[in-house]
């Protein structure tokens, strides 16, 4: 998509996640008076269907949209029908074997993975260790998922929208 190439403030992470950081004045960086801070941001979404990660709002791609961008928030979009594997949101460090009980390390969170699947479609994703996750969701049906070679982890799948 030629229009996508013109966007200097958007970053596609693989084919699944689009990050659109606020890069203009009135952003909240270093601001103490938030009354003048930006609350929306104009983004271009590549062709396809996208979901705003924080609100779950569905957007048509191939177009510009004014999206929520409250102070302290990053406009982040997930492509419809693709698997997004995530670790526990409470991880403090990706280093294993940390001896401080107050710090949740990689070894502790590696026991479970949450899979996000936005909208409808079918996708198969292989993790770094050979685990394969397969998700399917059709309109009017509940989503299903399977995990092959799960390496003793627990897996949950959250079907969004």
PLM segments and residue spans:
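Catalytic core of carbohydrate-active enzymes
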Residues: 1-154, 159
């Amino acid at each position: 998509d030629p229009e996508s190439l013109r966007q200097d403030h958007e970053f596609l992470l693989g084919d699944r996640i689009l990050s659109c950081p606020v890069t203009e004045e009135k952003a909240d960086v270093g601001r103490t008076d938030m009354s003048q801070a930006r609350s929306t941001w104009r983004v271009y979404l590549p062709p396809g269907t996208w979901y705003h990660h924080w609100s779950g709002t569905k957007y048509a791609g191939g177009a510009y949209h004014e999206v929520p961008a409250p102070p302290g928030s990053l406009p982040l979009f997930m492509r419809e029908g693709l698997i997004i594997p995530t670790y526990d949101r409470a991880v403090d460090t990706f280093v294993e074997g940390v001896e401080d009980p107050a710090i949740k390390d990689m070894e502790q969170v590696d026991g479970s993975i949450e899979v996000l699947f936005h909208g409808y479609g079918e996708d198969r994703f292989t993790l770094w260790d050979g685990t394969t996750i397969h998700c399917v969701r059709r309109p009017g049906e509940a989503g299903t998922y399977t995990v092959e070679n799960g390496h003793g982890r627990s897996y949950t799948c959250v079907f969004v929208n």
